[in-house]
Amino acid sequence: KIITDDQIAQTVVEEVIWSPSKDGYLKPKIRVKPIKLCGATITFVTVHNELYRRNNGIDVGAVVEIIRSGDVIPKVHNVLTPVEIQPPPEQYNVELKGVDYVLTNPNDDMTVRLKMIHAFFVNTGVAGLGRGNVQRIMNAGFNTVQDILNMSLEDFLTVDGFKDKTANKIRNSIQKCIIKCTLPELLVATNILGR
């Protein structure tokens, strides 16, 4: 596809944001000085992976050209002024594997755990367990899928903001969905086979 001048914009990287995936991959994205591109204001841009970021000198202060892949997802098209790369924050214990940083112990990271638990309940079709409710449940001390599956109605009522209606709805949805879940669906939901 040919990229025309109105489909590309130049801006400056203001921040590299690190977010672990449910599989323990530490993915970089960048916050840029806001720009207009194809009728939208762009603030956040995908960087693909760590190797791409590293090889192209993408960090705070880099001048980059942005396009919208498929006129939707903003991504770095070109780096006009590369800069020295900084490592991820020290809170992340990582190693470079292939093109990505991978957490050395992803099960210890609460963001990874939140995303894994949320994905499990999405893949099993449980209603009412979006990320916000999963976070509330984890804040109440139920930090694994097994913990949540074993929760009683009384346990759900200890969760901040949960009343009878919400607690019953989520508990009933869990019981209904887990009973009808097939083995292949359960394998996908648990992510036991990996990425």
Briefly describe each language-model feature range.
Residues 1-195:
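RNA/tRNA-interacting regions in translation and RNA-turnover enzymes
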